[in-house]
Curated annotation (Swiss-Prot):
Keywords: Cytoplasm, Nucleus
CC annotations in GO: cytosol; pICln-Sm protein complex; spliceosomal complex
Upper classification of the organism: Eukaryota, Fungi, Dikarya, Ascomycota, Saccharomycotina
Gene: LOT5
Any one of the GO BP annotations: mRNA cis splicing, via spliceosome
Pfam family, one: Voldacs
Signal peptide span: none
Family as reported in the entry's similarity comment: Belongs to the LOT5 family.
Location relative to the cell: Cytoplasm; Nucleus
The protein's name in its UniProt record: Protein LOT5
């Protein structure tokens, strides 16, 4: 396990219509500013996708133990919240190894996450040495209801509405969630790459190399004091302790006019 990356955590605040903003609503209500990311413009977490009534578990050879779970794909993390639970599982995007859509009996979402202490408490690893250096846990999310199944819920849906997420049931819900995870992981990796570039820019501006010593050996006093600002072509850049009586380097410029001189043309008989 990489000690530098964020780990999975348990959270006690469930996303609702009051503490998150669906991405479609955010686009309608917030102006876009050039050079400013969406995360900096929104005061609330942005909900890119998710859905209700997922069967959540892991791939096993025996009959899997699945439970009804809500999935929230936020701009900052992936959140799994089992039904009737008082806490949810927060998965940072840095911990996601891969995600995909798999066709089994029905379409299901596959999520491979790097193991840590939190995941080990929920899904204990197999005893014995691990065959790979990177220990991962493969989870699956399968919709309980198909796209056109009729079922009744005791609560009115206010977050995953048709206006913001379209037809978000069955296979369509799996595809929507997979696309939302891909979108969020893309700008997370892009932001991490930009941070790495900023760290590279903070490095030294000049490096001493053997080539520099070859061009300017020790004890050599240059005639021109070049500071890298194109000041080596002026007389002010000449040092006073240069060679006396020698040929001074210089530059001669000649400007010629291309205009023709008018002449009188003699007509021959």
């Amino acid at each position: 396990m990489n000690a530098d990356r964020p780990c999975c955590q348990f959270v006690t605040t469930k996303p609702t219509v009051e503490n998150v903003t669906p991405f479609a609503q955010f686009q309608l209500t917030q102006p876009r500013l050039k050079g400013v990311s969406l995360q900096q413009l929104s005061a609330l977490p942005i909900l890119y996708g998710g859905g209700r009534n997922f069967l959540f578990g892991r791939f096993t050879d025996s009959e899997p133990q699945l439970q009804d779970t809500d999935l929230f794909v936020l701009d900052s993390c992936i959140l799994l919240w089992p039904a009737h639970a008082l806490r949810g599982l927060r998965i940072p995007y840095d911990a996601v190894i891969y995600h995909a859509v798999r066709r089994a009996d029905v379409l299901e979402l596959v999520l491979a996450v790097e193991r840590d202490a939190t995941l080990d408490s929920l899904f204990p690893p197999a005893p014995g040495p691990q065959p790979f250096a990177l220990s991962t846990l493969e989870l699956r999310l399968r919709p309980r209801y198909a796209t056109y199944d009729r079922h009744y819920s005791g609560a009115v849906e206010q977050l995953f509405t048709f206006r913001d997420f379209g037809l978000n049931r069955g296979d369509a819900m799996v595809a929507n969630c997979n696309t939302a995870i891909a979108t969020c992981m893309e700008f997370h990796h892009r932001a991490a790459a930009a941070d790495d570039d900023d760290d590279d820019d903070d490095g030294p501006a000049a490096h001493v190399t053997p080539l520099a010593e070859l061009l300017a050996p020790a004890g050599h006093v240059p005639i021109y004091a070049n500071h890298g600002s194109a000041d080596d072509l002026t007389d002010d850049g000449l040092t006073d302790d240069g060679p006396q009586g020698g040929a001074a380097a210089g530059m001669a410029l000649a400007f010629c006019s291309a205009a023709r001189v008018p002449t009188k043309r003699r007509r021959q008989d």
